[in-house]
Each structure stands twice: as structure tokens, then as C-alpha cells.
Regions:
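Helix N-terminus capping/helix-initiation residues
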Residues: 64, 145, 170-173, 274, ...
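Generic detection of long, well-ordered alpha-helical segments
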Residues: 82-89, 102-106, 272-283, 347, ...
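Extended, helix-rich architectural segments
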Residues: 1-234, 239-240, 349-352, 445, ...
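Short intrinsically disordered coil segments
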Residues: 140-142, 163-168, 277-278, 472-480
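Catalytic nucleotidyl-transfer cores of nucleotide-processing enzymes
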Residues: 224, 228-321
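A broad, low-specificity signal for short, low-complexity segments enriched in glycine/proline
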Residues: 82-89, 192-194, 247-249, 264-268, ...
């Protein structure tokens, strides 16, 4: 039996994963079709002219929950139980915040919410870009499309899988630009991505090549640690292999740089189900009943006339509404009959089904800001909105847990590659040279360790606190300041309002200017 080369071995593993996940890709495509209201495509039509109505209740409900999740965009706060690392923890918080501003994490979060609610699971990738920040380098967290990543279908934890694959098609011109020495060796590999079933985009597959990125994790029984490697191949050619340059692994933490979030977890899998899976049947039935109502309305809109042969009337003559007189023998041979109306309970049932989709998904009237009982107070409406968004809070909790895990990997990458330089830059920007020296010393100590000290931990808070919570929180802080239990400076740190960081910076600059003017005098 011929021994497979490394490239052939990884292609074989990729095909195994790809074929095993064919049903999952079909489910994701179906969920996207349901989300955009295009779910009649797989229903055969008895009559090509029959109506196919769509009332996008499910789409509206999902978008309403996504809008709620906009108030839950996470922010990482680094804390330290040890006083020796307290100053460094504050610096790390600023570094992580800068990373997320650079990679536009708020936009990545919006993409994650779409995948989570529609497809049922979302993926974040954690990596390091050495060219970022003008060559200083920084870690990043970004969204990965669920249709372009493959996990081991055998394992329920992605960290236990044989590999993780990312894949995308690129033109041969792109390949020549990035891999000029290997591009001409690439051949057609017979791999084609699932394309849009509507056929809006019909690319020439012969002008592109599938680029596959493979992450492989191996366990060293002697050291009791894992190593993670990255390989890239396309057109039957191995393009990159980190095992040559980094035999101990790409990243010291030895984990797959991916975090998966499942909305409704599945037993025995790292993936999940979404709102479309839960409410697909209700959406289909409500639209089917709409079709019945519309058919009935179209039939009722046409007057029907029964004419017997003994009536003596001509059918074509009766169709001519411009005539005032029609000649015939027997008027009893002409009978009008109307389409029977549908029962009223059918209309009520349609409304009830749609109301249940909104209510059970959490997109009810209170979460939309509507009230049916005359509530006009802004505070009361905000409180009702917060109470009604349980579904959104549940999804946000899952996303925040995944975000914390991603930030922990992000900190490990900063510690491994550039923490010392980042700390110096942070304090130099503040014109604090002494602080820069202290931070660099603490950073160097941590960088010499094999992993981040357990006393440094990540907590997650939302960037924007909900209106009702912010009002209640700030009122408590004001009372504590008025009673003298805390100082105004502490109160400023505790209160929540937009532009807080800018206000603090202006106050510090003002104090610095006053001290300088006094020293000159």
C-alpha cells in the first residue's frame, strides 16, 4: 500500500470532515433561507400562479433580539488578586481595549450575533498580527463564518479534535501574488464550495483554488503539554508548515485558537441550534394558512355564474358587461354563486401563531418598547424592556463566556510576543516614565513564566449599561457621595455615562496644567 504524503494525508482528513458536515451545511443554508423569508423554494407548486405569501415574523423577531444584544457588547476588565500585579492588570485592560478598537470588535460582535441566532452557533478566532500598531504587533479576536470552518465531527470539545480547518477560494492571481514560487505548481483539486442556491453569483471555479488552513494539536506525553501547529495548502501543494519554523508550536498555550458558542447546545457536539430551528414550523404553517386565505380571497374576487343549456342565454353575451339587455328563454337557468368564506377562527389562529413566535422568542411588545396598558414613564418602559429581554440576556451570557475564554487566549499571546513593549508604550503615552519602568519589570516577569499567573483574571462587563440599570446604579452612587461614605473621585469611577473616559482625561489634563502653572510660579 502506497504511503500518503503529508499533503495527501491532510487533504484526506479535510474531505472526511467536509463530507461528514454536509448535513450541517444544508441545515445552515436552510436557516438562512428561512431568515430571509425564502422558504417556499423546497415546496412543489401545484399551480405556478398560486400565491406564496411570506410574513417575516421570524426575521423580525431575530433582528429584534440582535438589537437587544447591541446593549450587551462585552468589554474585558483585567483584575489581579496579588498587589504585585495590580498595576499591570490595569495596563492589560487598556491594552486589550486598544486591541479591540483596532480590530473593530463591535462589528465582529454583530456578525457573531447573526450566526448565533440564525445558525445556532458562532465562532471566534484569536490570533496575533506582528505587523499591527506600526510593527509593534498585537493580538486580535475576529469572527469566523460558520460556513467556512470545520471541526472534528467525532468530538464534542473542539480542543480534543484531530484538526480544525478553515477554507476559502482565492483566484490564481491572488495565489501568484502571495505564493509566487508555488502558484504554477497548483492543480485543480476537485474541491468546490457550496454556492448560493439562488444562483445570484456564478463564479468560474476553474479560475480559483481552494486555500485550506489546517490547525493540528498534538499531545506530548513526556512533557504533559500540547502543541498546536498551522499548515496551509492549496491545489495539492503544501504552502506553509509551522512545524518547520516552530517545532514547539505556533502559540505557547497549545490550544486551538478558536472558541465556539452554541445557542441551544446539542448533545455530543460542540455546535448548537438556533431560533430558526425552534420556530421554523410555526413560520411555515402561518404562511401556509396565509396562502389558503389569499386563495380564498382570489376566488371570492371573481363572480361565478352557472348557466344551463335550457336557459337560452349565450355565455359570451353574459360576459359582456357593457350590454344593458340580454336575451334568453328561462331566467331560472341562470344562477349566481359565491365562494364560501373561511371560518373566522382560522384568521384568529394565524394571528395567534405569529404572536407565539414573538412571545416565545422574546421579541414581545415590551422588548420593542410598546405597552398596551397606558405606561408612559420612560423609566417604567426601560424597566419593562429589561425584564422582557430574557432570551437576549441568555444569548449574551453565552457570548460573554466565550468572549472571556477568547480574551484569556488573547492575553497569553500578548504575554508571549509583545507585552513588555506594549506596557512601555502605554506609560510613555501617559508621560509616566517611572510607571513605564515598573510596568515593564512586571511584564518581563510574566513573560518569563510559562503561563499567565492565576492571580490575573478576566471579568466581563458590558460596554453600555442598560438605561434602567444605569439610572438605578448612578442614583445609588450619588447617595453614597452625598452621605460622605465615598469620595467624589471614587464616585466618578463608579458612575456610568457616555463620554466618561473623555471626562476623566479632561480632568487629568486640567489638574496637570494647574500643577505646572503653580510650579512655574
Amino acid at each position: 500500500m502506497k504511503k500518503l504524503t503529508d499533503t495527501e494525508k491532510y487533504y484526506s482528513l479535510f474531505r472526511e470532515f467536509y463530507e461528514a458536515c454536509a448535513g450541517e451545511r444544508a441545515r445552515i443554508d436552510k436557516c438562512e433561507s428561512m431568515f430571509r423569508g425564502d422558504h417556499w423554494y423546497d415546496v412543489p407548486a401545484d399551480d405556478p400562479k398560486e400565491p406564496r405569501p411570506v410574513t417575516p415574523v421570524l426575521h423580525s423577531s431575530i433582528e429584534n433580539i440582535r438589537a437587544d444584544l447591541e446593549d450587551y457588547i462585552p468589554e474585558a476588565i483585567i483584575t489581579a488578586d496579588s498587589a504585585a500585579y495590580s498595576e499591570l492588570a490595569g495596563t492589560l485592560t487598556g491594552i486589550i481595549r486598544e486591541n479591540h478598537l483596532n480590530c473593530s470588535y463591535d462589528e465582529e460582535f454583530r456578525k457573531l450575533t447573526h450566526d448565533l441566532l440564525v445558525s445556532g452557533w458562532a465562532v471566534q478566532e484569536i490570533g496575533y498580527d506582528p505587523a499591527a500598531l506600526n510593527g509593534m504587533g498585537s493580538a486580535f479576536i475576529r469572527h469566523v463564518d460558520v460556513g467556512s470552518v470545520l471541526f472534528d465531527p467525532v468530538e464534542s470539545d473542539i480542543q480534543d479534535g484531530r484538526a480544525v480547518f478553515k477554507f476559502a477560494r482565492h483566484t490564481r492571481e491572488w495565489m501568484r501574488e502571495h505564493y509566487p514560487e508555488l502558484a504554477d505548481s497548483m492543480k485543480d483539486d476537485g474541491l468546490f464550495m457550496d454556492t448560493d442556491e439562488k444562483g445570484y453569483l456564478t463564479p468560474r471555479m476553474d479560475k480559483s483554488v481552494m486555500l485550506i488552513e489546517c490547525w493540528e494539536r498534538e499531545y506530548d506525553s513526556k512533557t504533559g503539554k500540547h502543541r498546536v501547529h498551522m499548515l496551509k495548502f492549496a491545489g495539492g501543494v503544501m504552502l506553509e508548515d509551522s512545524r518547520k519554523d516552530y517545532p514547539d508550536g505556533v502559540y505557547a498555550h497549545g490550544k486551538y485558537p478558536f472558541v465556539v458558542t452554541a445557542l441551544f447546545p446539542r448533545r455530543g457536539s460542540s455546535l448548537g441550534y438556533g431560533f430558526v430551528d425552534m420556530f421554523e414550523t410555526s413560520q411555515r404553517y402561518s404562511d401556509k394558512l396565509d396562502q389558503i386565505v389569499m386563495k380564498n380571497a382570489m376566488l371570492a374576487s371573481h363572480n361565478k355564474l352557472l348557466v344551463t343549456g335550457a336557459s337560452g342565454f349565450d355565455e359570451e353575451d353574459l360576459k359582456d358587461w357593457s350590454k344593458e339587455v340580454h336575451r334568453g328563454d328561462n331566467l331560472n337557468g341562470v344562477t349566481w354563486f359565491a365562494t364560501a368564506p373561511l371560518p373566522q377562527y382560522l384568521i384568529s389562529y394565524i394571528e395567534q401563531m405569529r404572536a407565539e413566535i414573538k412571545e416565545e422568542s422574546g421579541a414581545n411588545q415590551w422588548s420593542r418598547g410598546n405597552t398596551a396598558y397606558g405606561v408612559t414613564s420612560g423609566t417604567a418602559i426601560a424597566a419593562l424592556q429589561e425584564r422582557s429581554s430574557k432570551r437576549a440576556r441568555m444569548a449574551a451570557k453565552s457570548l460573554h463566556t466565550a468572549f472571556r475564554m477568547a480574551v484569556e487566549q488573547e492575553m497569553e499571546l500578548e504575554r508571549e510576543f509583545a507585552l513588555g513593549l506594549r506596557c512601555i508604550k502605554t506609560y510613555i503615552d501617559r508621560s509616566d516614565e517611572e510607571g513605564a519602568r515598573r510596568a515593564e519589570a512586571a511584564a518581563r516577569e510574566i513573560m518569563n513564566k510559562e503561563e499567565m499567573p492565576i492571580s490575573i483574571r478576566v471579568t466581563v462587563k458590558v460596554q453600555k449599561t442598560a438605561g434602567f440599570s444605569a439610572i438605578s446604579h448612578n442614583d445609588t452612587v450619588f447617595r453614597l457621595v452625598e452621605s460622605g461614605m465615598i469620595t467624589p473621585e471614587v464616585g466618578l469611577e463608579l458612575i456610568v455615562f457616555d463620554g466618561k473616559e473623555q471626562a476623566k482625561a479632561l480632568m487629568k489634563n486640567s489638574e496637570f496644567g494647574i500643577r505646572n502653572s503653580e510650579s512655574i510660579r
